[in-house]
Amino acid sequence: MLPAKPTVTVAWMKERGKLLNNTVVTTVMSNFGLYKAFDEQGIGYAKTAVGDKYVYEYMAKNGCRIGGEQSGHIIFSKYASTGDGILTSLKMMEVMLAKKKPMSELAAPLKIYPQVLENVRVTDKKAAQNDEAVQAAVKNVAEALGDTGRILVR
């Protein structure tokens, strides 16, 4: 969720007291750097399954104002129930005008971590996820990464 530039809008919403429940809704595919930035800024986050449907569903149930996916689909629940690129652009422009700074400067502090997406075809997804060897390999990678990265198998 939330590429670098819309995260500027999240911080702006927090500054102005408009980040309801101090929470942003993301998906399990969101960049690791995003969570580190939110932690540093004291912004809470919730992770949902991938898809606007799941993001908005969580937002509606929990009174959250902003959420989205890494793809750039950003939802502002006060105005829409799906991602809206024009609305997102307007919200980012609002911050740039108020702060009198270019987006490049506003978004500079956010470090985006490298990500690798591997699609592996299997005949039985549940069996593959429940396989002890797969679980052990995932655990080993997660331990090796520590707090510098993550592994997601879905």
Model-derived features: where do they sit?
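Phosphate-binding and adjacent anionic-ligand microenvironments
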Residues: 16-154
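Cysteine protease catalytic core and zymogen-processing segment of caspase-like enzymes
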Residues: 1-13
